[in-house]
């Protein structure tokens, strides 16, 4: 019975090995529907699928048909986060190498599919707490793991089993606890010369800055988890600013022991750079960290 259920699930997935597509990363993001692209293809499909009774021109019966559409730009799109130029800057020279890429937080797997076709010789790993049935795709080089990033035991087992990665992309919780927990848990798994990417931190930072400003202007205390933003923290790492150690003494945030002095020592000793990048999209934000 279980084998029959699994067979039914996998038979409905889009087989990435059976699709021949362009190798341009932004086009792949648009085609598969990742919001990392300049245009958000998933939102177009979702929008017109809801309206298809009144829209005879939208002839795509399912997402596989949508992925295989011709004339990619002949549709109405919402603007995406425009991450492709940033990724291309760092990934272009290694796109044809055999590497290991891990994305943390994959939802239906549209970014995984894009990276699978872009890095056409590489192993692509994905982690998410959603059941594997929610993943739209399959491929011989694609590996998916149903893991909650806050489950320390499962994360330890995963990193022990799968060793180092050349690229790690955090696209999961987008808040302080999630971002810092992932950084601590996965930085050691980043290989020498590898890239650790943190996406979509800007909204959390702006929200926090406004809240701190409001309390200060009204002579009140800000009692959040910490008094720094994600952008501030990783800028301090890049500047090798040892004042970052003082952040560990802040309470109650660091009572959870997310960060430790020994971990920061490790980062300072192995970090080549940590740089933020933004596009003109209001929430587009990315930190690119390179390990020596």
Give the residues covered by each predicted segment:
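A short alpha-helical cap/connector motif
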Residues: 1-169, 173-198, 202-292
